[in-house]
């Protein structure tokens, strides 16, 4: 349940960031977004932090939720011991794949290269930035203090199970 909450939180940030970029630039091709971090810095910083959260880099909540999944897998009993390592290996592979498709967007956004002309600043409106910022801060804060979320979810899960 923790991973579902974490995943939805950071995916919301990423979708909001993508929506803001599409709305302000009209661009949907990643190659056309070189230098977008200079044009839309707040949006792209949120997108970058959301990307780190989805990959599972500390101090984002994604790290904590993946850590908990890995520990749960390693603590399993009643199965062949090599199967306990299957969960952490899959988590690591998925993190590498996620980094492979998100980090090029972030890196090209902030480091477009010398030959790219960066246009004027065109940051999203406050009605788009505020929710994105709140969720971004929440993902980092809950990553640093995960007990705030686990203490909230534990009674709910106990009642359901």
Language model: regions and residue ranges:
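Short alpha-helical catalytic segment bearing the HExxH-like zincin motif
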Residues: 1-8
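Alpha-helical transmembrane segments and their membrane-interface exit regions
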Residues: 9-14, 157-161
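Interfacial and helix-entry/exit segments of alpha-helical transmembrane bundles
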Residues: 12-77, 81-95, 120-138
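Cytoplasmic/organellar membrane-interface segments at the starts of transmembrane helices
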Residues: 37-44, 95, 99-161
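Membrane-interface interhelical loops and short amphipathic "cap" helices
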Residues: 1, 66-75, 154-161
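Divalent metal-coordination and catalytic microenvironments
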Residues: 7, 33, 62, 106, ...
């Amino acid at each position: 349940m923790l991973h579902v909450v974490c995943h939805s939180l950071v995916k919301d940030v990423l979708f909001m960031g993508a929506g803001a970029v599409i709305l302000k630039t009209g661009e949907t091709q990643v190659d056309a977004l070189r230098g977008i971090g200079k044009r839309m810095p707040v949006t792209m910083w949120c997108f970058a932090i959301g990307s780190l959260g989805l990959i599972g880099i500390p101090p984002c909540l994604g790290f904590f939720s993946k850590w908990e999944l890995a520990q749960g897998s390693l603590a399993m009993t009643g199965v062949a011991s090599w199967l306990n390592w299957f969960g952490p290996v899959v988590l690591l592979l998925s993190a590498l794949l996620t980094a492979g498709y998100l980090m090029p967007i972030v890196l090209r956004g902030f480091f477009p290269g010398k030959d790219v002309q960066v246009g004027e600043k065109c940051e999203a409106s406050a009605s788009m930035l505020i929710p994105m910022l709140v969720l971004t801060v929440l993902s980092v804060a809950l990553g640093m203090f995960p007990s705030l979320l686990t203490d909230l979810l534990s009674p709910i899960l106990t009642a359901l199970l």
